[in-house]
From Swiss-Prot:
Gene: stl1
Gene Ontology terms: biological process: fucose metabolic process
Localization of this protein: Membrane
Pathway: Mycotoxin biosynthesis
GO molecular function, one term: glycosyltransferase activity
Keywords assigned by UniProt, alphabetized: Carbohydrate metabolism, Fucose metabolism, Glycoprotein, Glycosyltransferase, Membrane, Transferase, Transmembrane, Transmembrane helix
Biotechnology: The structure of strobilurin A was used for the development of the major class of beta-methoxyacrylate agricultural fungicides since its beta-methoxyacrylate toxophore targets the Qo site of complex III of the mitochondrial electron transport chain and prevents adenosine triphosphate synthesis. Compounds such as azoxystrobin (Syngenta) and Kresoxim methyl (BASF) are among the most widely used fungicides worldwide. This class of antifungals are used as effective treatments against a broad range of destructive fungal plant pathogens and make significant contributions to food security.
Membrane topology, record value: Single-pass membrane protein
Transmembrane segments: 66-86
UniProt-annotated glycosylation sites, renumbered to this chain: N139, N255
Protein name (Swiss-Prot/TrEMBL): Strobilurin A biosynthesis cluster protein l1
Cellular component, GO annotation: membrane
Nucleotide-binding among keywords: no
Its job: Part of the gene cluster that mediates the biosynthesis of strobilurin A, an antifungal polyketide that contains a key beta-methoxyacrylate toxophore that targets the complex III of the mitochondrial electron transport chain. Strobilurin biosynthesis begins with construction of benzoyl CoA by step-wise elimination of ammonia from phenylalanine by the phenylalanine ammonia-lyase str11, oxygenation by str8 and retro-Claisen reaction to form benzoic acid, which is activated to its CoA thiolester benzoyl CoA by the dedicated CoA ligase str10.
Amino acid sequence: MDHALFRNLFGGFMNVRTLRSYQLLPSYEVLELPTNIIHAPPPNRFRRKPLQFAARILSSPLLRRALTIAILLPILYVLSGGIPPTYSDIHQFETNLPQHRTSGVDRRYLRFEGTLWGLGLNNILQEQLLLSYIAYASNRSFVFSDYTWSQLPLPYTLYDGALRPTHMPLNTFISAPTAGGDMPSIALTQDVFDEASMSGGPSPHDIRAVHLSHFDSVCPTSARVRLSSAAEERLSDDSLDGAELLNTWVEWLNNASDDPCLVVDFADKPVFNHLLFGSERVISMYPLLASTPILRDFKWSSLVQSAVDRNMEEIEKSADAAADVIPGLVAVHLRRGDYDGHCRYLAKWAIPYQGMNRFPGIVDTLDPEDFDHETESESAQLDHYLRHCLPDITQIVDRLREVRDESPELNLEKVYLLSNGDEWWLNELWEELEKDGWSPVEEGMTSSQDLDITNEEQYISGAIDMAIAEQAEVFIGNGFSSLSGNIIMFRMAKGVPVGSNRLL
């Protein structure tokens, strides 16, 4: 082998010059051997000089290249998914909300701490809607903050091998009263305040929500009155139905303090969590929310709405502007991915449908108590759950056909698939749907995967899907999903008949 090549390849492991420069040993003839010889083991160079040996290993060009590649490959893979946007313009929008410019000496605020984070949008949204209702009913301004996926003090975190924003402004998703939006249903809009200011007349009491940064500026820590959700047992009484629980909270807050800067901490006792939203207790909450601006004035953010308008601009809407539905369209929610394990967990513990998915008037039901555990095997129960939670292609096609046949007067012929499923699976499903007579909502747009969205819109694609599903003549949801439950709630709040909501 060429000497230069040998040195480049193995120079870090062996110094070639040391093989040539060792000293000559003395002749055995001049040595006087000892009478009692102890045979010692040969010296171990690595044991004597481990740091030197390690340094030689690490100085190898080949090893350095391998380490560099090993470090760069995962970084390049993560970066290939793109750098998430900062949404700085929306942060600025929230900072400059007009209600932040008015001092309002009689204004009272309600801030909740220890709330949910690290969960999907719809889990967070369920909680935020209820908390903003409590603030509204208590005649206080709700204090909202960012949607938080991670508490890391960094702009991004890793999720599924890609970068994801740790925080996002709530107004990337919604521009409703919960996120500081106007309340036109009770004439609480910026136009009303501007007119009052110009005329010199009295302004209405402003209870529009404010951002946390504004609350921090007007309510220093020393001025805040702090309460705990664990202060009274009735605040988390499981025997109360949803409406009674909300009324209990409003009554407690009204009696607790008149101070303008009120903070409630959920750290010691979570109340509005998955256990509540998974139960039928939330059904009695709906009329309260629907009668207030919290739902009556709910709307998606301009970022969500612009994506919907761009993707649906060629689609004809119903003549009924109030309902704003797309005639003949069925939107179906097909959750995949982590639901493979989640659905098996639901079957194992016989979990019922989510609360809002059990709303009276939804004809499709699942009652775990209907199972006879003595005569039906665990595999039979699992199969039944999977049919409704994680149906295969044949089961989906059959279910859509059933819904179409049950409502011939609606002329259901178009389908939109809300799904996080793999593209190959969605393509196979669509081939079977076409054979069964279905057409896409728009040419070339069959599912979430076909949406034309920007980098900013990519991280709110679930909300875009929900806004599209709200406009479907019929929605088929997943009974175990909070996303499906929220779609049903928003559809009902818009005046869409409850019977137009079906389940897999």
